[in-house]
Amino acid sequence: MKSNYSATNIKILKGLDAVKKRPGMYIGSTDSKGLHHMLWEILANSVDEVLAGYATNITVTLDLNNTITVSDDGRGIPYEIHQDSNISTIDTVFTFLHAGGKFDDQSYKLAGGLHGVGASVVNALSDHLEVTVKRNGQIYQSVYQAGGKIIQKAKKIGDTTSHGTTVSFHADPKVFKKAQFDSNIIKSRLKELSFLFAKLKLTFTDQKTNKTTVFFSTSGLVQFLDEINNTVETLGQKTLIKGEKDGIEVEVVFQFNQSDQETILSFANSIKTFEGGSHENGFCLAISDVINSYCRKYNLLKEKDKNFQLSEIRQGLNAIIKVNLPEKNIAFEGQTKSKLFSKEVKNVVYELVQQHYFQFLERNNNDAKLIIDKLLNARKIKEQIKQQRELKKSLSSPQKEKILFGKLAPCQTKKTSEKELFIVEGDSAGGTAKMGRDRIFQAILPLRGKVLNVEKINNKKEAITNEEILTLIFCIGTGILTNFNIKDLKYGKIIIMTDADNDGAHIQILLLTFFYRYMQPLIELGHVYLALPPLYKLETKDRKTVKYLWSDLELESVKLKLNNFTLQRYKGLGEMNADQLWDTTMNPTTRKLVQVKLDDLINAEKQINIFMGEKSDLRKHWIEANINFSVEN
């Protein structure tokens, strides 16, 4: 059947309709990440007032119904009738795409909200939004509903001696479904901003918990790096480099450490560039060139030795890169601004870092020796891993099958996106899972031996020769560390399914530590999940009602509604029969899965070091600060 294609098929989306039709083009997604991006857009406008030198306080409030409010003490959005829209400037900013104060080269010399769509996009994707502006001794207010429809045009509602802008919005549940603001994600971002702008006061109030947190830093990026380095053993001193060229301001602080994990955070005009870009490229290239030049000058690399690759140098490097660029120079890839694409900044960052870091190493020979000795040792380990990879390649199919024999129960489908790998604790639960699964798309891998704590080993060779770890590597297929290739992934979902007890939780942490250290992109790309088996089975005496419960809170709620029932507490997966395990934990339509996310890299690194590392004093401190040992009768 052919369809007609004519002029009537061409649609012109007016006003904010384009945003409502394709929200992902403007905020990246309509899940939790997209919801928080809405907040970042409004927050960026307040931060632009800080960049311009007019604001010193920002407050964020999350109320009980998921409405969020951002307030600053900047200049306030102008109220006057706009010459092009013929409505107030406040309403223009919130109802017209590409309307803002960042285009005239005068109001903001530096700004992060450059596309002029942030405020209007948030309005388009909210079912309610209010703007209150304090400016020139007067208070103005606008109210919008249903995706930007003006309910109350901007009007004067009072007088004031203060100044600033307050925006409150409630995201449209039709767009964001069940997504909720996460106070931990918000606090993490505000904490970053306090480090980026020393002496800026940021206050967050979560009305759900009735807690207020204040973020304030006196030493900026140096304090930020100290926070990142809190749980690692550092090598030498911190290096702080500041400079300016052609109107581009650069501030970089970095330090090497004994681990092999890198944390490189970059910001452009206060916008966090998750995917890096030209400023990161300039920094990394400069560090690489300086270290290799230093090694050649002092014969620390033999003539036959190859230069250190950037991937080698970045291991154990923690760095924060902050650049401020004039509006004419700055360009981001995409509306979500996750990657900086300004060509000029790469050269400026490179020149400043290259010049100052070489001088730093010349003045601090002991620091240079510590760093380069570590790089040489890491190169030896890399060679060992390469040999192990060659061993893997050399294994014939029968040999690989021998390693997996009696362990992996494969599935039938060949489509990676549909395949699920359940990593199960022990043969007992593994046997039940094999019987209860859907063989078409679900594979089962029981773990028989103890999972290695990779955080406590000194040599990576110990990890890649451990039988359980080697089995995981073969099953998943991507390789590890620098040899990781997501294209070789064999399963769309990797699901850790353990007992709902302390031992099960410990196995989860051991496996997550391995994935985080050796296969981090699996987590970053959303392939790792935790299965949630129920804690209780409740059945009425007449056997007409059977309920599975996942928490004590659910249990107490059900007890109020039902009488005459029997209750079974599951101590392990093996206590369920195959049908029960399928219904509660494996069936995609009824199960509960938790996707493991890496929203806060710094906090993840810190938690891994605390719980799985060698420093018992860190664990003791965490327990004392977070666990209440009081007993209630």
Curated annotation (Swiss-Prot):
Keywords: ATP-binding, DNA-binding, Isomerase, Magnesium, Metal-binding, Nucleotide-binding, Topoisomerase. GO terms for biological process: DNA topological change. One of its GO terms (molecular function) is DNA negative supercoiling activity. Binds two Mg(2+) per subunit. The magnesium ions form salt bridges with both the protein and the DNA. Can also accept other divalent metal cations, such as Mn(2+) or Ca(2+). Its cofactor is Mg(2+); Mn(2+); Ca(2+). Mg(2+) 2 binds at D499, D501. The record marks K450, N453, H506, R619 as: Interaction with DNA. It catalyses: ATP-dependent breakage, passage and rejoining of double-stranded DNA. Mg(2+) 1 binds at E425, D499. Topoisomerase IV is essential for chromosome segregation. It relaxes supercoiled DNA. Performs the decatenation events required during the replication of a circular DNA molecule. Belongs to the type II topoisomerase family. ParE type 2 subfamily. This is DNA topoisomerase 4 subunit B. It comes from Mycoplasma genitalium (strain ATCC 33530 / DSM 19775 / NCTC 10195 / G37) (Mycoplasmoides genitalium).
